Regions:
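A solvent-exposed interaction/effector surface
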Residues: 2, 12-177
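Sec-dependent signal peptide recognition
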Residues: 1-7
Length: 177
């Protein structure tokens, strides 16, 4: 029993040590934040086995054979029935300095800056929760008279699947600010 408790504690501690994508909160509206996200290097894939492909990339399946530190959040979108997953690369990487993926389905790019409205929720994320919080976010934005640039939800997950308590997930939409 003690070894299971120690395993749980180590997994929980390990999952909290990742570099997290930077953003600036520019406005708070009750449970909603309007944030500015500066450009950041990301790796994305829209092919089957998204997480596995990206995890292999950061585990050394790249031209340099370089192991890349995991970061948070993991970003997921569904545009036109195409699921895309993105990992934020550590801040030391730039357009001139990044590990080139061997998997040609993975694209590494510098994201555009932008303003996004975010709503946070706990527990494990699923389709029903995403729909619920996406609807709530859009409702609150209409009430606040904030213009939505792209209403498609961006789902952010900050925790390892092994973390059971105090999980953090978010739904974002791009807004004009």
């Amino acid at each position: 029993m003690i070894k299971y408790v120690l395993l749980f504690i180590s997994i929980t501690m390990f999952s909290q040590g990742y570099e997290t994508q930077k953003y600036e909160v520019v406005k708070k509206l009750n449970e909603i934040e309007v944030r500015f996200y500066p450009p950041v290097m990301k790796a994305k894939v829209s092919a089957g086995g998204n997480f596995s492909r990206l995890f292999k990339y950061i585990s050394g399946n790249n031209e340099q054979g370089e192991k890349i530190s995991m970061t948070t959040p993991v970003q997921m979108t569904n545009q036109d029935n195409i699921n895309t997953m993105e990992f934020v690369l550590p801040s030391k990487y730039s357009e001139d300095n990044f590990a080139v993926p061997k998997d040609r389905n993975i694209t590494v790019y510098n994201s555009d800056p932008g303003h996004f409205a975010a709503i946070t929720y706990g527990g494990y994320s699923n389709t029903e929760k995403v729909k619920k919080y996406h609807s709530l976010l859009l409702k609150k934005l209409r009430e606040s008279k904030l213009e939505v640039v792209n209403s498609k939800p961006v789902v952010l997950s900050y925790n390892s699947p092994y973390k059971v308590f105090n999980r953090r997930n978010e739904v974002l939409v791009e807004v004009k600010y």
